Amino acid sequence: MTERAAAAPRGPYGAWLCLLVALALEVVRVGSNQNTLDPIYLPVALELLDAPEHFRVQQVGHYPPANSSLGSRSETFLLMQPWPRAQPLLRASYPPFATQQVVPPRVTEPHRRPVPWDVRAVSVEAAVTPAEPYARVLFHLKGQDWPPGPGSLPCARLHATHPAGTAHQACRFQPSLGACVVELQFPSQWFSQSATTRAELAYTLEPAGEGPGGCGPGTEEEPKEQALPVGSVELHPEDPPQHQEVPLDEVVTLRAPDVPVRPGQLFTATLLLRHNFTASLLTLRIKVKKGLQVTAARPAQPTFWTAKLDRFKGSKHHTSLITCHRTGPAGPDSRPLELPEFLWVDFAVENSTGGGVAVTRPVTWQLEYPGQAPEAEKDKMVWEILFSERDIRALIPLAKAEELVNTAPLTGVPQRIPVRLVTVDSGGALEEVTEHIGCESANTQVLQVSEACDAVFVAGQESRGAKGVRVDFWWRRLRASLKLTVWAPLLPLRIELTDTTLEQIRGWRVPGPAEGQLEPEAAAEEVERRSRGCRLQYQRAGVRFLVPFAAHPLDGGRRLTHLLGPDWLLDVSHLVAAHAHVQDPRIATLEGGRILVGREPGVTSIEVRSPLSDSILGEQALAVTDDKVSVLDLRVQPVMGISLSLSRGVSHPGEVTATCWAQSALPAPKQEVALSLWLSFSDHTLAPAELYDRNDLGLSVSAEEPSAVVPAEEQRAQLGVVVSGVGAKGLPLHVALHPPEPCRRGRHRVPLASGTAWLGLPPLPTPAPALPSSPARTPPFTEASVEGKRQVAGDMGSHVGPGIRGKFERAEEEAGKEENEAKEEEEDEEEMVPAPQRVTDLELGMYALLGIFCLAFLIFLVNGVVFVLRYQRKEPPDSVTDPASPQPHNWVWLGTNQEELSRQLDRCSSSSPPKGEGGCPCESGAGGDTSTVAPSASESPAGSTSTLARKEAGGRRKRVEFVTFAPAPPAQEAPEEPVGAPAVQSILVAGEEDIRWVCEDMGLKDPEELRNYMERIRGSS
């Protein structure tokens, strides 16, 4: 039972131990991963030139990208609008070095080939017939404007592929519109006599040539992979009807042509009768404007109807009256004409109706019946006929871009896309339409259209984005639609800080009065520091403003389509930096909208307010504390040139990724070398030196060879040296960070941190010999200056002058003078504690693992102690002397003979037990008095027994007596038992007649049973 109870805790504690081990391994794994993904990069400036609208983008939780390092940087840009005028440039600069490259062309589907122009192709006809065997396709250059000269625009060649053969035709882009139309005629053998066939259309772009229209003759070969798809066109065996039907009343319908008519053209309108027409007389009144006249009225069935035409000319209108009589027999058996057509009206168009501009001419139709009420005669139908000297085939809107990023809610500045309307005629000519245009947006919550219909825009009040939002345009009787994609920001903004807790930097003081409350100091030191005009430097953090953009479904669903993907964010820092501020500027301030500077301890937040409604678009809490951190070391990267690589992405046609590397090969003599610095703090944060004011950084550079390096010119290198000569083994440069010279007092002359950079290839690591331990670790090269003359202690190396990136602080003074100044101007001892070496994340994980194991062992030990104490409390008080002894038995006397009880007790006390047997302690109580006796073989009975004799004053009465037999202690001179012998407890045994009262509760009343029981007891004794 005891072993089972002791083994019970093993199960749950074993599970806890396994869980702790798994947690520790996860900590180590995460620590290992974090150790390889330090947020460092080469702080080179990357900028796009000649790109009107672009954004920096990043993946959630991946900044900088994984391929960035101390010597490289990678950035992804998103170009929203194409660039027909010139290819944009991406420039990378890290003074004094700079390079640039032309952004590669956009990648288009389906073959992911880059093309230098962004072209939109629109098919005008969806079907062609043998009567009109022409396929017309409009090509439009999207993007910004281009030079007016025709030399820079390419040609577009349309390719048609049919089972019967191939055909192609080219056109040259017009500089005025940036568009052209290809009219390709299909051969007659492509048309089937009974079935509809299909031809596939594709296009290619080619430089302008010397052929007709400025394009080359082309080849008959199939375009294969170079062609970009346009769509398909159907080839019908016969002409489809091109007319429209309009009812004049309940029984008469007008059928009119649905195509524009040209000057001098004749066309015919047809009247149709329903079968329930029963009238015998019908009068048709037609009123037309000048330029159009009715030439004839012919009945479709002269045997049943007659038609008489009367014409009346007016100053503005011409009226034609057509009277129709039924000539068939009248009566109940007469039936209406079986043919639906019963009257043909011929019209003629006069020349010079519109001066080349499309116009409409209204034609008024009115039916009159005999005996008709005067009110019914007022019902008229007006039909407009489109007149044009050109055979206009389609109205097409041209937009500069097909997608729009709605940044108006962030900036308050409307975003516009210019739109131009053009018409396409049968000869392939283009004409811009500027007057009498109508337009309407299908969803004003996503996109709006201007009153002049020359642009679509977003003003900031829109609440959604969408893909394929439609804007309708119409001109005369022609209609067209433009579909766009609008990306809307998903608020709130994400404000990303490189460090949300800014702390004081130990030992780093900068010029300027103390801002706010300083650290607790003595009054004398406070006055002294204020008199010197130096204050503590707080950490700084970089600030970036990010937001995802998405398009909502048009059907009102909840599934969003994200720009680039759900895990991509657009950097809008350049748009919202002017509207961002710190809520409490006493605690921190924003410099340039990109750098957060701590001022005094406190908690505040950065917030961005909308310029339209003053609402908060985004907020991020931050804290400035008076806790101190140390600069552990400097990470130095020499830059002797930069290389740039550009690549196109696959998530979006405008995605461009730029990767820049620092060249760190063996420098040539007199070569300038820039140094990139990163500060590593004891709170496991990293910051580039560019975050700090260059005047607050005191940097010194030293080398082993005194003449190896000299300072670089300040106006060229931000922090650099000129290398005079480097051996084949490379040259180490040692960089040290100090406070600025005005605040470099006393012990503050000790470098805050230092780092080493190798020019050329660093040497292979070799095992260091055993050296005697030194009391303190000192920098390998120490600099000093006396009256402006630069020296190096011990003649160990050379150094360069003041400044960060070209401005080196003055070197330190002599060691003796430094010690004197240190005694005169003693600073806080806390600030002068040497910065501890950085503990890596892997070491932290190992320490965490060790701590967890120790904690598990401690918990197990405490559990064991608690378990032992718990079971010790369950032992009886009489067995304290011998925990292995059995528990005592409380025997109950049920007899009435008090004298017999006394006699039995006296007999027990006077008898001497055999050797090896224990005594029989007797215990009885009356009135609360108890006594215990435990005789042994070496003790006298008088000193170990207690006899309880009770006499009752009221006569003989039946009593119940309680007697306790305690176990006897071991004999003092007992012989040693053999090893492994069982432990036997001796008890005092009386005769059968003396202990009958003892065993009655055991059910042993038969003498034979009692005798056997006593023999077993003696045998065990």
Swiss-Prot record:
The keyword rRNA processing does not apply. GO terms for molecular function: protein homodimerization activity. Keywords: Endoplasmic reticulum, Glycoprotein, Golgi apparatus, Membrane, Signal, Transmembrane, Transmembrane helix. Residues 929-948 have a biased composition (Polar residues). Residues 33-848 are extracellular. Residues 1-32 form the signal peptide. Glycans are attached at N276. GO terms for cellular component: endoplasmic reticulum; endoplasmic reticulum membrane; Golgi membrane; plasma membrane. Residues 870-1021 are cytoplasmic. It is found in: Golgi apparatus membrane; Endoplasmic reticulum membrane. One of its GO terms (biological process) is positive regulation of Wnt signaling pathway. Residues 207-226, 793-835, 903-955 are annotated as: Disordered. Pfam families: Ig_TMEM132_2nd, Ig_TMEM132_4th, Ig_TMEM132_5th, Ig_TMEM132_6th, TMEM132_3rd, TMEM132_C, TMEM132_N. The keyword Ligase does not apply. InterPro entries: Ig_TMEM132_2nd (IPR055422), Ig_TMEM132_5th (IPR055423), Ig_TMEM132_6th (IPR055424), TMEM132 (IPR026307), TMEM132_3rd (IPR055421), TMEM132_C (IPR031436), TMEM132_M (IPR031437), TMEM132_N (IPR031435). This is Transmembrane protein 132A. It comes from Rattus norvegicus (Rat). The lineage of its organism: Eukaryota, Metazoa, Chordata, Craniata, Vertebrata. The gene is Tmem132a.
